[in-house]
Design a protein with these regions (language model features):
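Short secondary-structure capping/turn micro-motifs that flank functional sites
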Residues: 7-9, 83-85, 201
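Hydrophobic targeting/anchoring helices
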Residues: 10-12, 107-108, 119-231
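Active-site neighborhood of glycoside hydrolase catalytic domains
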Residues: 52-159
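Short, surface-exposed linear patches
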Residues: 22-25, 98-101, 186-187, 214-218
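Repeat-unit-sized solenoid/scaffold elements
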Residues: 17-42, 85-100, 145-179
Length: 231
């Protein structure tokens, strides 16, 4: 497991690696002002997003190569938090968009550029991993999501060797999303695994547990729609 989209240490040490909005501000998962006071209400979680078009990409490549070299058996690598719909206007992205003639006022064009950056990054990782562990499975989480569907529309999931469908129905998309999502990938010939958890609102939310009946229903739905179960 490797968290691509969330690394507080790297974001603090290298602000030039962070995703930026049109005004140059760092893009975060939730609002938490830099000058917030100790007793101000805090979001459930918050982090700064990092851009694959910066030195962060090289940093990841170095770390993944170290993993591949140090461990003689690597059966797979699972990379988390790929969100192309969070458009980036950092210096590197702005410069490349200008070079490619991308209209920065065209949301669809900027989105396609973001997918292009992610695609290049993912293909480089796939090539690197295959040099050391050609049989290893590789998955980039976020590419199979049908909500906020920029990754999905541009078929970013083609860089995966298998498809995991992240599904917390009580917070993301409800219970009607899985049938459509699973059938799409099964009909395309992919093996699929559906991921859910005891959490109601987010991964790592400690506010409560789902009722056992709800978990059994989710497991039955996964099996009914042809997926492996992962809780």
């Amino acid at each position: 497991y490797y968290t691509f989209g969330w690394s507080c240490n790297d974001a603090e040490a290298h602000p030039d690696w962070c995703v930026r909005d049109r005004k140059g501000a760092i893009v975060t998962s939730d609002v938490w002002p830099e000058d917030a006071k100790a007793d101000d209400p805090k979001p459930s979680y918050q982090w700064k997003f990092l851009c694959a078009n910066t030195g962060y990409h090289d940093h990841i490549m170095e770390q993944v190569e170290e993993i591949c070299k140090r461990y003689p058996v690597v059966d797979g690598l699972w990379f988390d938090i790929y969100m192309s719909f969070r458009h980036c206007f950092c210096d590197a992205c702005t410069k490349e968009m200008e070079e490619l003639g991308v209209d920065k006022d065209d949301e669809e064009a900027v989105g396609a550029f973001n997918v292009h950056v992610m695609d290049r990054h993912q293909k480089a990782l796939r090539e690197l991993i295959s040099q050391y562990h050609p049989a290893a499975v590789v998955f980039f989480n976020g590419t199979t999501a049908i909500e906020n569907g920029l990754n999905f529309r541009h078929e970013a999931y083609e860089n995966n060797t298998m498809q995991d469908l992240e599904d917390l129905p009580t917070t993301w998309g409800g219970y009607d999303k899985l049938p459509l999502q699973s059938k799409h990938f099964l009909n395309a010939g992919w093996p699929i695994t559906v991921m859910s958890g005891k959490f109601h609102k987010a991964w790592g939310e400690f506010g409560g547990f789902k009722d056992p009946t709800a978990l059994k229903y989710e497991a039955a739905s996964m099996i009914a729609w042809g997926a492996n179960c992962n809780f």
